[in-house]
Amino acid sequence: MYQDKILVRQLGLQPYEPVSQAMHEFTDTRDENTPDEIWLVEHFPVFTQGQAGKAEHVLMPGDIPVIQSDRGGQVTYHGPGQQVMYVLLNLKRRKLGVRELVTLLEQTVVNTLAERGIDAHPRADAPGVYVGEKKICSLGLRIRRGCSFHGLALNVNMDLSPFLRINPCGYAGMEMAKISQWDNNATTDNIAPRLLANILALLNNPPHEYIPA
């Protein structure tokens, strides 16, 4: 069935705001026949403040812009070397609940890291994926008219120092991690295809097609 197909866009390195705007336009204009999409992207340095975000968690942004976002959660950082995956899914059509989608995204990351010998886990008290006590992946979603947007951000081989300018996801002193601390060969180029393969597997391997950005 055509509607089961997922279209995949690889967007490369992009500013946050135009991609966010395009994601909103896609979600606002889609109907029950619109195929789902997954967008793979890296962003230029930016702090994004989620709907629950409190200004006091942005400690000293300095030269990095702070942008308000309508995803769930608190403040986080995006930058080159972090793989972002936006999931634009019709949850009703795929018979997925919001909590199920969160669990599916967390498991996608856990499975991707396990392929590289990294033992990661979600936490009941703080969304995302962790290696030990350190956070390696942030999650933030929004649901509109039964469709998801926003998604996850997995730290691959990025500079983690900007996270010190914020309380990541509202947790003071939350330590961040990246895949390259365990695997020097990790890049967004080789992690993105595995993230995609693992989420598709958890969605029961629907047909998918890469489309030009």
Swiss-Prot record:
Gene3D superfamilies documented for this protein: Bira Bifunctional Protein, Domain 2
Entries under InterPro entries matching the protein: aa-tRNA-synth_II/BPL/LPL, BPL_LPL_catalytic, Octanoyltransferase, Octanoyltransferase_CS
**UniProt lineage:** Bacteria, Pseudomonadati, Pseudomonadota, Gammaproteobacteria, Enterobacterales
The name of this protein is Octanoyltransferase
Q: Recite the UniProt keywords alphabetically.
A: Acyltransferase, Cytoplasm, Transferase
Pathway(s) the chain acts in: Protein modification; protein lipoylation via endogenous pathway; protein N(6)-(lipoyl)lysine from octanoyl-[acyl-carrier-protein]: step 1/2
Q: Which residues form the active site?
A: 169
Q: Catalyzes what?
A: octanoyl-[ACP] + L-lysyl-[protein] = N(6)-octanoyl-L-lysyl-[protein] + holo-[ACP] + H(+)
Q: Where are the transmembrane segments?
A: none
Q: Any additional notes?
A: In the reaction, the free carboxyl group of octanoic acid is attached via an amide linkage to the epsilon-amino group of a specific lysine residue of lipoyl domains of lipoate-dependent enzymes.
Q: Please, one GO biological process term?
A: protein modification process
| Main location, first listed in the record | cytoplasm
The UniProt site entry described as Lowers pKa of active site Cys is assigned to: 135
In its keyword annotation, does this UniProt entry include Acyltransferase?
yes
Q: Which GO terms describe its molecular function?
A: lipoyl(octanoyl) transferase activity
Give the EC number(s) under which this enzyme is classified: 2.3.1.181
Residue ranges of every copy of the BPL/LPL catalytic domain listed in the record? 32-207
Identify the species of origin: Citrobacter koseri (strain ATCC BAA-895 / CDC 4225-83 / SGSC4696)
Name of the coding gene? lipB
Give the subcellular location.
Cytoplasm
Kindly list the positions annotated as binding substrate.
71-78, 138-140, 151-153
Purpose of the protein: Catalyzes the transfer of endogenously produced octanoic acid from octanoyl-acyl-carrier-protein onto the lipoyl domains of lipoate-dependent enzymes. Lipoyl-ACP can also act as a substrate although octanoyl-ACP is likely to be the physiological substrate.
**What Gene Ontology cellular-component terms does the record carry?**
cytoplasm
Q: Which family does it belong to?
A: Belongs to the LipB family.
